[in-house]
UniProtKB/Swiss-Prot annotation:
Its main location: cytoplasm. This is Shikimate kinase. Substrate binds at residues 41, 65, 87, 144. Belongs to the shikimate kinase family. GO terms for molecular function: ATP binding; magnesium ion binding; shikimate kinase activity. The gene is aroK. Pfam families: SKI. It comes from Acinetobacter baumannii (strain AYE).
Length: 180
C-alpha cells in the first residue's frame, strides 16, 4: 500500500533511449506509488487515432515532434503521475523545460548493446527501420545523451537489475534526497 509520504512527491518523468525500459519500469514505479501511469507515445496514438509509424510516414519526424510537444505540455500539467516519454522527446527545448520544471526527471541510461537486444524485432520504431540499426542507436545516443543528462535530476543504469528492482531503486533515491 502506498505511503502518505508519496502524496507530496511531484510527477515523475522517465526519459531515455528506445529500449531503456521506460514503460515497464514506469508501470512498476506507478504501482509502488499508487499513481496513474501514462506513456506519452501511447497517449499520442490515442489522441490522434494513428500509430507512430503512420505519423512519421505521413508527417515526418517534425510533424510527430509537434504532436509530442502538445501532448507533453498537457500531460506534465497533470498531478500524481508517472510518465514514460518517447526516446526523442528531449530533442525539443519546450519538452525539456516542461519536464525539468514540472516534476522529477529520471534518465534510464541504457548501453547501445542492450537497446539493440530489446528493440531489434520491433517494427513500430520508425527510426530503426534502417540498414544498420546499431549504428543508428549509437548516433542517436551521441546526440541525445547530453540532453537526457541536462534534463535529468537522477540517472539510473538499466543494465543493473529487473524492472521492478529499478523502480524500487528510483523510489529510494528520490525519497532519500527528499529527506535531506
Amino acid at each position: 500500500m502506498p505511503s502518505k509520504a508519496f502524496e507530496t512527491l511531484p510527477n515523475i518523468y522517465l526519459v531515455g533511449p528506445m529500449g531503456a525500459g521506460k514503460t515497464t519500469v514506469g508501470r512498476h514505479l506507478a504501482e509502488l506509488l499508487g499513481r496513474e501511469f501514462l506513456d506519452s507515445d501511447h497517449e499520442i496514438e490515442r489522441k490522434t487515432g494513428a500509430t507512430i509509424p503512420w505519423i512519421f510516414e505521413k508527417e515526418g519526424e517534425v510533424g510527430f515532434r509537434t504532436r509530442e510537444t502538445v501532448v507533453l505540455n498537457e500531460l506534465t500539467s497533470r498531478k500524481a503521475l508517472v510518465l514514460a516519454t518517447g526516446g526523442g522527446a528531449i530533442t525539443q527545448a519546450p519538452n525539456r523545460e516542461f519536464l525539468k520544471q514540472r516534476g522529477i526527471v529520471v534518465y534510464l541510461y541504457t548501453p547501445v548493446e542492450l537497446q539493440l537486444q530489446r528493440t531489434y524485432r520491433d517494427k513500430n520504431r520508425p527510426l530503426l527501420q534502417v540498414e544498420n540499426p546499431e549504428q543508428k542507436l549509437r548516433d542517436l545516443l551521441k546526440i541525445r545523451d547530453p540532453l537526457y543528462r541536462e534534463v535529468a535530476h537522477y540517472t539510473i543504469e538499466t543494465n543493473q537489475g529487473a524492472a521492478r528492482d529499478l523502480a524500487q531503486k528510483i523510489l529510494q533515491l528520490i525519497l532519500s534526497n527528499k529527506l535531506k
